[in-house]
């Protein structure tokens, strides 16, 4: 089908992700020692290139036997997370669902946002294959990034003279007036 499955040996956890977030996710899993640069992942991933309609059998077979699954979807409300939760209940699967509990409700899921979500999600489970040290290193790095960003916000920004945007119809008139002065 249109959706892709990538298996991994850490079989009791997994990630269901919107297709557009896959590349950033795999890059961040690599940083955490959970994937390699060829896209081989140690954590099973179901990539939803088509998010509607969801295929219940596909979702339930991915989640079956897993202690937990993280649903990564941008935007609010969390349509996929709700639908997947419904599919799991109907299939009577006890897989714990994570999503907006560890990821922001709104805004773009940048690399650092995804990393923080992964750290918060995986940090709740200390079982085989998830390296606590890598998680702590990434958490510390993110804390450092936030501190540096905060410090940068407090610096004075050099003044910028007013001007018209490229493509503005008023721009040539303004330029002509400046030339006449």
Regions found by a protein language model. Name each.
Residues 36, 88, 156-159:
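Residue-level signal for the start and early helices of compact helical domains
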Residues 7-54, 91-96, 176, 180-181:
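Anionic-ligand anchoring segments at beta-strand to alpha-helix junctions in alpha/beta enzyme folds, i.e.
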Residues 38-140:
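Terminal amphipathic helices with adjacent charged low-complexity linkers/tails
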Residues 21-24, 28-35, 62-66, 83-87, ...:
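Generic, well-ordered alpha-helical scaffold segments in large soluble proteins
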